[in-house]
Amino acid sequence: DMRLISGIPPWCQMYFDRLSAKANGKKIKDIFKNFSLFVYGGVNFEPYRARIEESIGKKISTIETYPASEGFIAFQDAQQDKGLLLLADAGIFYEFIPTDEYFNENPTRLSLAEVELNKNYALIMSTNAGLWGYAIGDTVKFISKNPYKILV
């Protein structure tokens, strides 16, 4: 009895396709009657949403996470909220470079206290001891500063 699944949307879709094929084309809701939650991260879900919902065969709750090799960055803490709660107390020091300055020789690095709402920033992560600063290749936009919530 599978009640939830967590993963990267295209991999979950491949899993759903294999399950359906093994079950003579049944929808996931018919294979796992109590399936009700999909926790995802790693890529934008929207390009996969319609196909995954079709494979499942019913509306289910979803929760977005923002994991990275460098650390767990944020998660959706409210079902109706599109923003992700930034984990500001988990051993990662964040800095933010305005995207229009990213390729400058000495771009401005902003702390959490200095970011502005609805502006795009390149995300820089460091250890809390400041050992290194690493641009992970993602951009974020703050939609709240109390608490800090982002869109990736």
Task: Give the role of each language-model region.
Residues 1-152:
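Active-site glycine/GP-rich loop and adjacent strand/helix microenvironment
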